[in-house]
Amino acid sequence: MPDFQFEKNLVLNYLKELDKADPESVAEVINKYASPNFHLRCVHPFNDLIGAEKIASNFWTTIKKSFMPLQRRMDIFYAGSNLIDNHETRWVTNMGHLLGLFQEPFLGIPATQKAAFLRYAEFYRIENEKIVEGAFFLDIMNFMQQLGLSIIPESTGVVGITPGPMTHDGLKFEKQPEQEGIDTLNLIIRMAKRLVGAGLQTTKSDLELDWTEDMLWWGPGGIGASYTQKGYLKGHTRPFEDNLDFVSFPGHILENAEGNIGGWFGWPSLLMKAKGNYMGLTSTSDKIAEMRVVDLYRRSGNKLSENWIFIDHLHFLKGLGVDLLDRYKKLKSPE
């Protein structure tokens, strides 16, 4: 039976020190736990970063200077081998919110001096007792909607603080039964193959094969959450499918599971074109844009009950010609 306890403890220790570090000490912490060429994929506008100094100065320093003190509120934590490379590599995943006092401007957005929740999901590959590769998805659009910024139209789902699993069993700090993880991975792969095979077109009968009736779809900023199969079709599937054309599925970088939790991320996961007014921000275009996506799932028996989704919407929309950060800065400019 595979044992991922070393990898889990390494990442937990890394996160503990990282969270406590002041902006000037972040690079030192990263160097302690990561390889010299540690590659971290971050959402736009941070994007691909390599090495402790760049990761610290370009990403973590920005976060920590704007939101301090920073508190990690983790809802999902698990580890597993990667199906994509025939289970050769070992990865650790965690998801939750970073809570901080919004004290200084962030990406041109003025500080509120109030508490702010930064929804996140992150992934780390461990090799030779070091973190060598990872991804950090920060839901910046969700944060912008928390602040009520008018540049983002009303979502078709509910936007707010995203809870963890209803069963409160998302933190897999201890070793889990191997078969449980296998069952979870098999189910989410079956569901995904059906969805991609249908060109991302979903029907009620499709949902009934893989999902509980009272499913919870915790969508990203810009879309929001949906409850029940009927609510999911109305709040996400129909607006998504009606306004975007599926071009191709480049594949995922990671697919794994442990216990009743599993998921993946891609860089990108999908290539899409706008064929309508997606989120009230796009128009029909021949531009092909990259959609970087995270999906994490909770399995209940032989069906999926919950799904947490992150989309790097700032990157995707920019590929379609809509730069939300630039638009916001221009709207707030005195000239």
Regions found by a protein language model. Give the residues of each.
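C-terminal and inter-domain tail/linker signature
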Residues: 1-335
